[in-house]
A protein has these predicted regions:
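Positively charged n-region of N-terminal signal peptides that target proteins for export
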Residues: 2, 18-25, 39-40
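Cationic, low-complexity basic patches in intrinsically disordered or flexible, solvent-exposed regions
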Residues: 7
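Sec-dependent N-terminal signal peptides
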Residues: 25-33
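C-terminal motif of bacterial Sec signal peptides marking the signal peptidase cleavage site
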Residues: 35-37
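Signature of exported/secreted
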Residues: 41-371
């Protein structure tokens, strides 16, 4: 065989080999693409069951898992291996409500067994408008919108409402004037994403306005000074910081698992001898809502003193239970509904006879009442 023929055969062999190799490469590429496509259809992910808090493994479309991941990054209440943490993801320009409502029904039983009942209600309306969010700090305007209170007993009732005209009764005018001067004002709140209140400012103009509002009712300088001092002690940055922290930041900074409980204790009396304990438990995080249950109170306390031959014995007890719900997307409180029952009994005795008076108060404390 001539050299030329041998070269032609070798060239044909190389061409044939290359064609087969390209076919295999193309086939392999199609198989690879098919496999990648299959992998993109589903993906195994680990999730936390919101009801039980247990870790479960499920197959989900990869698009859905990606969407889930993106949504989780935007949520204010997120979980990491079953531990839920609360933050705030508020939107610039949006306004968030914080309306508090409390109703008390008290029944007193006299020593002769006769009973007398009375009730009272109070509503405070305010909203929070987000002005800006910069370097992890929210700039928020607190809008003081309205205050209403009412009392009813023995078939009679009185109402003080900033959205209605000034009451005619002299004893009610002062409270109405103070409340009327208070609403319509704004405060400025600086808060970080964790809910830590950095500052609340804007009190001085409100102090001036409220003090001036009672000028026609309080004429003596000493009384005006005493009133201004008392008002400042009940309405200031420290008081509002405590109120907002208590109402807005519910989940501990370390986080909580489904079923976890944590307890907070505060003084129920100025001397701190009686403590109020509140136990919270993370019940569930599902459908965009975190649900927290509330229980606790003040255990039964007894006190006895004798003076001038008269022994005075007193027992008291407080219990509370209810539910708080938070919006998972923003971290803001959606609703709170807590029932509080206070029982008190007082007995006077001279050793020969005794008289006992009992009092039972049932209260409902609601934040952002459901309309």
């Amino acid at each position: 065989m001539s050299l030329i023929l041998k070269l032609l055969k070798i060239i044909n062999y190389i061409i044939h080999f290359r064609k087969n190799l390209m076919k295999k490469i193309i086939a392999a590429a199609f198989i690879s693409i098919a496999l990648i496509s299959c992998k993109k259809e589903t993906q195994t992910v680990t999730k936390i069951d919101p009801k039980t808090g247990k870790t479960v493994t499920v197959e989900v479309p990869i698009n859905d898992s990606l969407k889930t991941g993106t949504a989780s990054e935007k949520l204010a209440i997120i979980d990491s291996l079953g531990v839920f943490k609360q933050s705030f993801k508020l939107v610039k320009g949006d306004t968030y409500p914080l309306t508090t409502f409390q109703k008390d029904v008290q029944t007193m039983t006299a020593p002769d067994g006769k009973t007398q009942s009375g009730s009272s209600e109070s509503t405070d309306q305010m909203t929070f408008t987000v002005n800006n969010f910069d370097k992890g700090i929210y700039d928020i305007t607190i809008n003081l919108l309205g205050k209403r209170s009412s009392q009813a007993a023995n078939g009679k009732s009185v109402v003080i409402d900033t959205k209605t005209a000034e009451p005619k009764e002299e004893q009610l005018k002062m409270m109405w004037k103070v409340n009327k001067a208070l609403v319509g004002n704004t405060l400025n709140l600086k808060m970080d994403e964790s809910g830590k209140v950095i500052s609340i400012t804007g009190f001085d103009p409100i102090y001036t306005k409220v003090t001036a509002s009672v000028g026609t009712l309080i004429k003596e300088a000493a009384q005006k000074t005493a009133f201004a001092k008392s008002f400042k002690e009940s309405f200031n940055e420290k008081i509002l910081k405590e109120q907002f922290t208590k109402n807005l930041v519910l989940i501990p900074s370390k986080g909580a698992k489904i079923g976890d409980k944590w307890t907070e204790t505060e003084n129920a009396t100025p001397d701190g001898k009686i403590k109020l304990s509140t136990t919270y438990s993370l019940k569930s995080v599902e459908n965009g809502i975190a649900t927290i249950t509330v229980s606790g109170g003040i255990p039964a306390k007894s006190d006895q003193k004798t003076q001038d031959g008269i022994t005075r014995s007193m027992t008291s007890e407080l219990s509370q239970n209810g539910t708080i719900t938070l919006d998972q997307k923003t971290g803001w409180i959606k609703n709170q509904n807590i029932a509080v029952k206070t029982s008190q009994s007082e007995t006077l005795s001279d050793g020969k006879q005794k008289q006992t008076m009992k009092s039972v108060s049932n209260s409902t404390v609601v934040v952002n009442p459901v309309k």
